[in-house]
C-alpha cells in the first residue's frame, strides 16, 4: 500500500510525514513549555543560592568600583593579579582589625547593656493618680521594648560568625571583580547610544554616592571624636578611637556609626550622668547617624549626580526600607536610571510622532 500521493503540481505528499508534521506543533509547544520551566527553576535556585550572600556581593562590587583607579595604577607596576591580591590583603587586614575591636570593646558593652535591660524589667511603675489600667499598658509597652532590645543584643553577639562568613565572601568577590575588571567592563559596553546614556547615568550616580559616602563618613568620625570630648565620655585617645570606629562601622553592612554614640550614651547614663548621656544621644542622632544619612547625603548626591534631591531621598528611604543598608546605594541608582529610560522613551515617542 502506497503511503504517498502525487499532487497536480508534482509535489509528493507523504501521509506518515504529514501526520508527524501535524503532531509537530503541539509537541514543540510542550517542549518549549518544559524548557521554560527548567530555565525558570534554575534561575530561581540560582537566586536562592546567591541571596544569602547578596549583601557582601553587592558591597564587594562597590568596593572594587571604588578601588578601580588605584588598581589600574598598581596593575601597571606589579600586574593585575598582584595588585588584586595586595588590595584584598589590605582589606583583610582592616576586617581583622575591626573584628578585634568588636571582640574587645563592644562585647563587654553589649553584656552590660543586656544586664541593664534585665534590671529594668524588675522595676515597677508607680505613678500617683494614674489608673492601674494605664500603668499596666505602659508596663506592657516597656516590657515589649526591653524584650526587643535584648533580642537585638543577642543577635549582635551571635553575628560574629556571620560577619566572618560575609567577610570571606566579600573579599573573594572583591578579588574576583578586580582580576576580571576587563571582562566586566566589556560586558557593560554597548554600541546603542540610548543604552550608553542610561549606563552613564547609573555610573554618574554611583560615583556621586561613593564620593559622598567617603566624605560623609570621615566627617562623621570627626564629629564623633568631638562629641566624646564635649560630653566627657573619655580622654582624647579613646575619643579618636571612637571616631575611627565610626568611620569604619559606616562602611560595614552589619553595623553603623550610631552604635558608637549609643554605647557612649549608655556608659554616661550608667555612670549617673543622665543629662550628658541624653545630650550625646541627641548629638549623635542629629549629627552622626542616622539623620545625616537622610538629610545631608541626598543633597550632596543630588548635586554631584545632577539629580533632584527629593528623588534621591525617596530612593534612599525606599531602598533602605526594601533592601536594607544596600538600598541607600541601589535606590537612587535605580530611580536615576529609570528616569533616564523614561526620557529616552519620550524622545523616541516624539521622533515617531514627527515622522
Swiss-Prot record:
Q: Which Pfam family, just one, is annotated for this protein?
A: AI-2E_transport
Annotated InterPro entries: AI-2E-like (IPR002549)
- Where does the record place it? Cell membrane
For membrane topology, the record states: Multi-pass membrane protein
One CC-aspect GO term? plasma membrane
Report keywords, A-Z. Answer: Cell membrane, Membrane, Transmembrane, Transmembrane helix, Transport
According to its UniProt record, where is this protein mainly located? membrane
Can you tell which superkingdom this protein's organism belongs to? Archaea
- Entry's transmembrane regions: 34-54, 55-75, 84-104, 158-178, 212-232, 240-260, 274-294, 310-330
Q: Which cysteines are joined by disulfide bonds?
A: none
Residue ranges of coiled coil? none
Q: Which family does it belong to?
A: Belongs to the autoinducer-2 exporter (AI-2E) (TC 2.A.86) family.
Mind telling me what this protein is named?
Putative transport protein PH1000
Which species is this record about?
Pyrococcus horikoshii (strain ATCC 700860 / DSM 12428 / JCM 9974 / NBRC 100139 / OT-3)
Amino acid at each position: 500500500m502506497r503511503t504517498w500521493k502525487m499532487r497536480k503540481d508534482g509535489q509528493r505528499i507523504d501521509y506518515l510525514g504529514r501526520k508527524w508534521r501535524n503532531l509537530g506543533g503541539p509537541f514543540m509547544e510542550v517542549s518549549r513549555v518544559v524548557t521554560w520551566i527548567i530555565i525558570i527553576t534554575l534561575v530561581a535556585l540560582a537566586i536562592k543560592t546567591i541571596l544569602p550572600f547578596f549583601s557582601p556581593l553587592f558591597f564587594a562590587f562597590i568596593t572594587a568600583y571604588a578601588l578601580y583607579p588605584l588598581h589600574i595604577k598598581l596593575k601597571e607596576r606589579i600586574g593585575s593579579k598582584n595588585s588584586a591580591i595586595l588590595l584584598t590583603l589590605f582589606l583583610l587586614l582592616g576586617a581583622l582589625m575591626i573584628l578585634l575591636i568588636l571582640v574587645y570593646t563592644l562585647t563587654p558593652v553589649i553584656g552590660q547593656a543586656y544586664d541593664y535591660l534585665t534590671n529594668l524589667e524588675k522595676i515597677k511603675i508607680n505613678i500617683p493618680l494614674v489608673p492601674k489600667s494605664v500603668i499596666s499598658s505602659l508596663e506592657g509597652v516597656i516590657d515589649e521594648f526591653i524584650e526587643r532590645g535584648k533580642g537585638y543584643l543577642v543577635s549582635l553577639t551571635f553575628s560574629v560568625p556571620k560577619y566572618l562568613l560575609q567577610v570571606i565572601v566579600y573579599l573573594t568577590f572583591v578579588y574576583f571583580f578586580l582580576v576580571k575588571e576587563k571582562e566586566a567592563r566589556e560586558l557593560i559596553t554597548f554600541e546603542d547610544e540610548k543604552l550608553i546614556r542610561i549606563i552613564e547615568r547609573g555610573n554618574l550616580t554611583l560615583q556621586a554616592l561613593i564620593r559622598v559616602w567617603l566624605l560623609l563618613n570621615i566627617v562623621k568620625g570627626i564629629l564623633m571624636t568631638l562629641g566624646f570630648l564635649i560630653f566627657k565620655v573619655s580622654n582624647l585617645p579613646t575619643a579618636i578611637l571612637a571616631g575611627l570606629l565610626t568611620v569604619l562601622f559606616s562602611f560595614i553592612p552589619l553595623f553603623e556609626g550610631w552604635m558608637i554614640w549609643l554605647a557612649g550614651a549608655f556608659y554616661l547614663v550608667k555612670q549617673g550622668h543622665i543629662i550628658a548621656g541624653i545630650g550625646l544621644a541627641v548629638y549623635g542622632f542629629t549629627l552622626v547617624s542616622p539623620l545625616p544619612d537622610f538629610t545631608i547625603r541626598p543633597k550632596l548626591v543630588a548635586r554631584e549626580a545632577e539629580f533632584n534631591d527629593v528623588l534621591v531621598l525617596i530612593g534612599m528611604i525606599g531602598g533602605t526600607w526594601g533592601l536594607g543598608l544596600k538600598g541607600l546605594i541601589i535606590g537612587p541608582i535605580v530611580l536615576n536610571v529609570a528616569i533616564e529610560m523614561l526620557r529616552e522613551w519620550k524622545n523616541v515617542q516624539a521622533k515617531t510622532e514627527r515622522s
